[in-house]
UniProtKB/Swiss-Prot annotation:
Its EC number is 1.2.1.12. The active site is at 149 (nucleophile). GO terms for biological process: glucose metabolic process; glycolytic process. The record marks 176 as: Activates thiol group during catalysis. Keywords: Cytoplasm, Glycolysis, NAD, Oxidoreductase. It catalyses: D-glyceraldehyde 3-phosphate + phosphate + NAD(+) = (2R)-3-phospho-glyceroyl phosphate + NADH + H(+). D-glyceraldehyde 3-phosphate binds at residues 148-150, 179, 208-209, 231. One of its GO terms (molecular function) is glyceraldehyde-3-phosphate dehydrogenase (NAD+) (phosphorylating) activity. Homotetramer. This is Glyceraldehyde-3-phosphate dehydrogenase. It is found in: Cytoplasm. It comes from Glossina morsitans morsitans (Savannah tsetse fly).
Length: 333
């Protein structure tokens, strides 16, 4: 299997490495201009949210050594200067949050990369959501996007509902955990004034393209979904509230049955189902994209229903990055 490089060793970059180790994918190089190798060891070993790394991690002669395997470390600001080929890295995870267009992400090809997966939504790169539209991938695609964590939660659920009951239209709200772009105390935030308010003190209404992006991965839903976010003072795990008008009448029990069926069948490992009395911290470390909360949803009538689905917005998403790469590798071979 082709080897992986990670550009940007932040929350997602580090968790993609953890996910790769869990899934038997080989990461051979990491680039981050702001973190030296000793600091990488520390950040990878200790994680306030996901706990201490269970394996071994050390620095040795400029390499990051994880579970005895050497990972080449680069410290380049300009992606055109990263010599991926020297480390044998062909599939690059672009997790800086900076190079999110085809043009910008294509900078990695200069150093020998063959494919780039952007771990964020992209304005122009084809977007993929595991369990939803992977079959649309073709080996001639060089730069792709794994969409957002919220789209990865919403799209599998929306697909199941649309395939079985037809979504006429819908609105989504994500109650979203704090992320690194937010402020610890009030501070300037460009044009998004509310986003600059203290993350630990506030529920912050924010924009999200996650619902509209579903229309890119499920074309039949294009223009039928939109949504917004509330940023809340929790460190991890978010929850999608999808309220939809259905084309076909359905009881809530019928909807639950179809979601359960999908979670045990074609979407196993992507979509999960629970009837337990769960709260957000119960999903820290959950590797699914979306966990349907059967007890939290509520119908108004047989054509109008609110559906609830949880997601570990860090680790579930990072696992999908590796799943997407593995799928690409199987098709590119």
């Amino acid at each position: 299997m082709s080897k992986i490089g990670i550009n940007g060793f932040g929350r997602i970059g580090r968790l993609v490495l953890r996910a790769a180790l869990d899934k038997g994918a080989e990461v051979v190089a990491v680039n981050d201009p702001f973190i030296d190798v000793n600091y990488m060891v520390y950040l990878f070993k200790y994680d306030s949210t996901h706990g201490r790394f269970k394996g071994t991690v050390a620095a040795d002669g400029g390499f990051l050594v994880v579970n005895g395997k050497k990972i080449t470390v680069f410290c380049e600001r300009d992606p055109t200067n990263i010599n991926w080929a020297s480390a044998g890295a062909e599939y690059i995870v672009e997790s800086t949050g900076v190079f999110t267009t085809i043009d910008k992400a294509s900078a990695h090809f200069k150093g020998g990369a063959k494919k780039v997966v952007i771990s964020a939504p992209s304005a122009d790169a084809p977007m993929f959501v595991c369990g939803v539209n992977l079959e649309a991938y073709s080996p001639d695609m060089k730069v792709v996007s794994n969409a957002s964590c919220t789209t990865n939660c919403l799209a599998p659920l929306a697909k199941v509902i649309h395939d079985n009951f037809e979504i006429v239209e819908g609105l989504m709200t994500t109650v979203h955990a704090t992320t690194a772009t937010q402020k610890t105390v009030d501070g300037p935030s460009g044009k998004l004034w509310r986003d600059g308010r203290g993350a630990a003190q506030n529920i912050i209404p924010a924009s999200t393209g996650a619902a509209k992006a579903v229309g890119k991965v499920i074309p039949e839903l294009n223009g039928k979904l939109t949504g917004m976010a509330f940023r809340v003072p929790t460190p991890n795990v978010s929850v999608v509230d999808l309220t939809v008008r259905l084309g076909k009448s359905a009881t809530y029990d019928e909807i639950k049955a179809k979601v359960l069926e999908a979670s045990q069948g074609p979407m196993k490992g992507i979509l999960d189902y629970t009837e337990e009395e769960v709260v957000s911290t119960d999903f820290v470390g959950d590797t699914h994209s979306s966990v349907f909360d059967a007890k939290a949803g509520i119908p108004l009538n047989d054509k109008f229903v609110k559906l609830i689905s949880w997601y570990d917005n860090e680790f579930g998403y990072s696992n999908r990055v590796i799943d997407l790469i593995k799928y690409m590798q199987s098709k590119d071979a």
